[in-house]
């Protein structure tokens, strides 16, 4: 039965990668609250750049979190020639109920991926690259050495490129993971808290709020000159006071960059949206972030952790 389940997961993932860009956006109003006007996205009439980036990905056997997570900003980012690469395969060892990435038994690590990633960065003429990954609890180091290898290959071929990594929590191997990544450190180290402590068991089963904060703080202690970053999604039942407390916790852990966006339900099988946060509330949180000492803050309904990431490094 396990082998059949694995094949179904792989087949599902294969089909998902071939979905045309114009159909990847979840019609959330079919499943819950009516989607407000400020969340409606205009799709581009010309998909030439989108298709070009997809072709580069397929030729180099690469994945983007933009496609895997059904990001609402895919069309905009692809048309700007940017993408967030997802390494270590497209199958996650965890099953967070908010996330659209496939879960199951992952494949072997592709040792050619760092080189292929470097080639894609050159082909796309990237000045800023964001690299993330699925959770790989099956690997002794959580995939951290692979992150390090990707950074090394990219810098070798693209010495001027800015590299941002969005990492998992490296459960059970934090020290090893941070040592591996610090060998070839990025320009920005990002790990998303995603939600408030009270909702963690619901939103991030298998994760731990304190552990995630410690990961960010420990990286900063090892690499004090490299900015750390984190992100939150709203609309799952949190209060404004709880959001601000999380922001304060991040500052206590030396995090200097933050992104806050609206949670959008990928399918009817995922967590239900509790409410749609008005843009005015996001603007208020943006001001609060700067008052708390964040050097960069981006808060808005469609903001995601890598949204306009190329502009964030300018604050340093």
Curated annotation (Swiss-Prot):
Positions contributing to [4Fe-4S] cluster 1 binding: 66, 71, 77, 306
Asked if the Swiss-Prot or TrEMBL record annotates the protein with the keyword 4Fe-4S, the reply is yes
How cofactor binds (record note)? Binds 2 [4Fe-4S] clusters per subunit. One cluster is coordinated with 3 cysteines and an exchangeable S-adenosyl-L-methionine.
Q: What class of enzyme is it?
A: transferase
* Principal location listed in the UniProt entry: cytoplasm
Provide the Radical SAM core domain boundaries.
78-295
Listed A to Z, the keywords are:
4Fe-4S, Cytoplasm, Iron, Iron-sulfur, Metal-binding, S-adenosyl-L-methionine, Transferase
Q: What is its EC number?
A: 2.8.1.8
Catalytic activity, per the record?
[[Fe-S] cluster scaffold protein carrying a second [4Fe-4S](2+) cluster] + N(6)-octanoyl-L-lysyl-[protein] + 2 oxidized [2Fe-2S]-[ferredoxin] + 2 S-adenosyl-L-methionine + 4 H(+) = [[Fe-S] cluster scaffold protein] + N(6)-[(R)-dihydrolipoyl]-L-lysyl-[protein] + 4 Fe(3+) + 2 hydrogen sulfide + 2 5'-deoxyadenosine + 2 L-methionine + 2 reduced [2Fe-2S]-[ferredoxin]
The residues listed in the UniProt record as binding [4Fe-4S] cluster 2, with positions renumbered to this chain, are 92, 96, 99
Where is coiled-coil annotated?
none
| InterPro entries, alphabetized | Aldolase_TIM, Elp3/MiaA/NifB-like_rSAM, LIAS_N, Lipoyl_synth, rSAM
Identify the Pfam families for this entry.
LIAS_N (PF16881), Radical_SAM (PF04055)
Report the pathway entry: Protein modification; protein lipoylation via endogenous pathway; protein N(6)-(lipoyl)lysine from octanoyl-[acyl-carrier-protein]: step 2/2
Where in the cell?
A: Cytoplasm
Among its keywords, does the record have RNA-binding? no
Any idea which GO molecular function terms this record carries?
A: 4 iron, 4 sulfur cluster binding; lipoate synthase activity; metal ion binding
What CDD domains does this protein's entry cite? Answer: Radical_SAM
Q: Which cofactor does it need?
A: [4Fe-4S] cluster
An example GO CC term for this entry is: cytoplasm
Family, similarity comment: Belongs to the radical SAM superfamily. Lipoyl synthase family.
The protein's name: Lipoyl synthase
The species this protein belongs to is Wigglesworthia glossinidia brevipalpis
């Amino acid at each position: 039965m396990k082998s059949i389940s694995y094949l179904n997961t792989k087949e599902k993932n294969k089909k998902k990668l071939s979905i045309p860009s114009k159909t990847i956006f979840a019609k959330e109003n079919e499943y819950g609250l009516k989607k407000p006007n400020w969340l409606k996205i205009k799709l581009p009439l010309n998909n030439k750049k989108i298709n070009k980036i997809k072709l580069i990905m397929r030729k180099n056997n690469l994945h983007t979190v933009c496609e895997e997570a059904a990001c609402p900003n895919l069309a905009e980012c692809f048309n700007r020639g940017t993408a967030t690469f997802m390494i270590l395969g497209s199958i996650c060892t965890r099953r967070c109920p908010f996330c659209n990435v496939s879960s199951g038994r992952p494949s072997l690590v592709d040792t050619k991926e760092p080189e292929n990633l470097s080639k894609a960065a050159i082909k796309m003429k990237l000045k800023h690259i964001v690299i993330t990954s699925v959770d790989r609890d099956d690997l002794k180091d959580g995939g951290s050495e692979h992150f390090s290898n990707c950074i090394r290959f990219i810098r070798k071929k693209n010495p001027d490129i800015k590299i941002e990594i969005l990492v998992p929590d490296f459960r059970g191997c934090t020290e090893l993971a941070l040592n591996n990544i610090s060998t070839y450190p990025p320009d920005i180290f990002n790990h998303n808290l995603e939600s408030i402590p009270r909702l963690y068991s619901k939103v991030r089963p298998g994760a731990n709020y304190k552990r995630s904060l410690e990961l960010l703080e420990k990286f900063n202690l090892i690499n004090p000159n490299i900015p750390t970053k984190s992100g939150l999604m709203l609309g799952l039942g949190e209060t404004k006071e709880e959001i601000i407390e999380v922001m304060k916790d991040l500052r206590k852990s030396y995090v200097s960059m933050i992104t806050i966006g609206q949670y959008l339900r990928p399918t009817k099988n995922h967590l239900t949206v509790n409410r749609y946060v008005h843009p005015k509330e996001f603007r208020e949180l943006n001001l609060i972030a700067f008052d708390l000492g964040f050097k960069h803050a981006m808060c808005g309904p469609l903001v995601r952790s890598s949204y306009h990431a190329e502009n964030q490094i300018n604050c340093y």
